[in-house]
């Protein structure tokens, strides 16, 4: 029985990156051998065990054989006869198909180290095409390693295009799409994930709502990049730069979906796109089974981002409706994520990436003065039922109007 460190830990060691988790392959052993040593079985589809002390994963060396469409369509075979090289052969990319022996020796049968040095993301074998999730993983690695200068090997991109043409990508289930998508969104540079998917044709199958934005013009006076899809990716890059969490980045990605439904005869304008986008956002979130927090923020940013941008121009009554539409008087925690997404949208324009967003400070102050108006004095004054709500609304509008009168206007940019 021999144990090898495999996969991402070996790759990250060679790149000089922090190793966050370690996975191991055990060659020449049976499940009983590990159980006798106190390892706890956790694998449902194939033999994976947790170390009794470190709780790191140890998997028996295995091979796999394609039996049907999608990532579920595999039969696995684990036995003491399976070699390390056979186990590494089933992995997706050469940079993930290396191992280290306990004496430090590097086992690299598929030239992963060479591809690391050449900054190439290359598939191990034609078996890559058997699992559509690998396209998403490839795109995610392109995002993760973009700062290091990695690119997808041309032959790997060609194989991905063939997978899309063969319909293999259509077998992806929503849970796996969301799992890879959400991980990619949280990378420091998430944009290459979508670039790679678009380049191989997978974006149109996995996220058609997003793919449709490319080629749709925008007014160049406001959007020097001139293309809705490009603006969306620029805004996404800004959301990462500003430190947005997953709900913020997801909301930014979806905020302009409504522009795909604008009749071409009114291009490059997109009147009411914020209204038309809401049902598209809701349907996409439902299809991918996105978490509630992601759904809620995406819907609100889609619906209200234009009002946030125009905050200084709104009437006091409209400003109050914005605060109420965001449900801030009950859910104050929504304010900062909403403002961050709106700032990313405003900065997601070619040449305007460092533009200030004074609307955020103003909207914080607007919420503060409006929230300071409560029902208590009106209840104490004897107001009843609807009278109370009407009085609170009147007083909040009065407070917001006073704020607008006294608040210093920002310089035009």
UniProtKB/Swiss-Prot annotation:
SUPFAM superfamilies: Nucleotidyltransferase, Poly A polymerase C-terminal region-like
Domain HD: 228-329
Family matches, as Pfam families: HD, PolyA_pol, PolyA_pol_RNAbd
Entry binding sites for Mg(2+): 21, 23
Keywords of this entry: ATP-binding, Hydrolase, Magnesium, Metal-binding, Multifunctional enzyme, Nickel, Nucleotide-binding, Nucleotidyltransferase, RNA repair, RNA-binding, Transferase, tRNA processing
GO molecular-function term, one example from the UniProt record: tRNA binding
InterPro entries: CCA_bact, HD/PDEase_dom, HD_domain, NT_sf, PolA_pol_head_dom, PolyA_RNA-bd, tRNA_CCA-adding_enzyme
An example Gene Ontology biological process: tRNA 3'-terminal CCA addition
Additional notes on this entry: A single active site specifically recognizes both ATP and CTP and is responsible for their addition.
Assembly notes: Monomer. Can also form homodimers and oligomers.
Domain remark from Swiss-Prot or TrEMBL: Comprises two domains: an N-terminal domain containing the nucleotidyltransferase activity and a C-terminal HD domain associated with both phosphodiesterase and phosphatase activities.
Function (record text): Catalyzes the addition and repair of the essential 3'-terminal CCA sequence in tRNAs without using a nucleic acid template. Adds these three nucleotides in the order of C, C, and A to the tRNA nucleotide-73, using CTP and ATP as substrates and producing inorganic pyrophosphate. tRNA 3'-terminal CCA addition is required both for tRNA processing and repair. Also involved in tRNA surveillance by mediating tandem CCA addition to generate a CCACCA at the 3' terminus of unstable tRNAs. While stable tRNAs receive only 3'-terminal CCA, unstable tRNAs are marked with CCACCA and rapidly degraded.
Protein name per the record: Multifunctional CCA protein
Gene designation per UniProt: cca
């Amino acid at each position: 029985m021999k144990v090898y460190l495999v996969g991402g830990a070996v790759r990250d060691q060679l790149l000089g990156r922090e190793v966050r988790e370690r996975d191991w392959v055990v060659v020449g052993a049976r499940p009983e051998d590990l159980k006798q040593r106190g390892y706890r079985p956790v694998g449902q589809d194939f033999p994976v065990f947790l170390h009794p002390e470190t709780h790191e994963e140890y998997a028996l060396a295995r091979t796999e054989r394609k039996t049907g469409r999608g990532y579920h369509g595999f039969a696995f075979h684990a036995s003491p006869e399976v070699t390390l090289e056979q186990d590494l052969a089933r992995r997706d990319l050469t940079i993930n198909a290396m191992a280290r022996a306990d004496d430090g020796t590097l086992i690299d049968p598929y030239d992963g180290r060479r591809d690391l040095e050449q900054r190439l993301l290359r598939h191990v074998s034609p078996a890559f095409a058997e699992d559509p999730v690998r396209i998403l993983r490839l795109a995610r690695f392109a995002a993760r390693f973009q700062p290091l200068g990695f690119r997808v090997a041309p032959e790997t991109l060609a194989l991905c295009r063939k997978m899309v043409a063969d319909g293999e990508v259509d077998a992806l289930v929503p849970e796996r799409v969301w799992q890879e998508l959400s991980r990619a969104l949280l990378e420091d540079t998430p944009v290459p994930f979508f670039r790679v998917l678009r380049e191989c044709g997978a974006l149109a199958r996995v996220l058609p709502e997003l793919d449709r934005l490319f080629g749709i013009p925008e007014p160049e006076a406001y959007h020097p990049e001139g293309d809705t899809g490009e603006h969306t990716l620029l805004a996404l890059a800004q959301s990462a730069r500003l430190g947005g969490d997953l709900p913020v980045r997801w909301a930014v990605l979806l905020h302009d979906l409504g522009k795909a439904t604008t009749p071409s005869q009114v291009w490059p304008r997109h009147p009411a796109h914020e209204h038309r986008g809401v049902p598209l956002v809701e349907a996409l979130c439902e299809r991918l089974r996105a978490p509630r927090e992601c759904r809620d923020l995406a819907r609100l940013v889609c619906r209200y981002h234009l009002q946030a941008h125009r905050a200084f121009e709104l009437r006091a009554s409209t400003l109050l409706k914005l605060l109420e539409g965001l449900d801030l008087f009950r859910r104050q925690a929504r304010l900062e994520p909403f403002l961050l997404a709106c700032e990313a949208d405003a900065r997601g324009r070619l040449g305007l990436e460092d533009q200030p967003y004074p609307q955020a400070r103003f909207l914080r102050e607007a919420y503060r003065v409006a929230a300071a108006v409560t029902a208590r004095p009106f209840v104490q004054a004897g107001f009843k039922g609807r009278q109370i709500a009407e009085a609170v609304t009147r007083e909040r509008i009065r407070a917001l109007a006073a704020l607008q009168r006294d608040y210093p206007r920002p310089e035009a940019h």
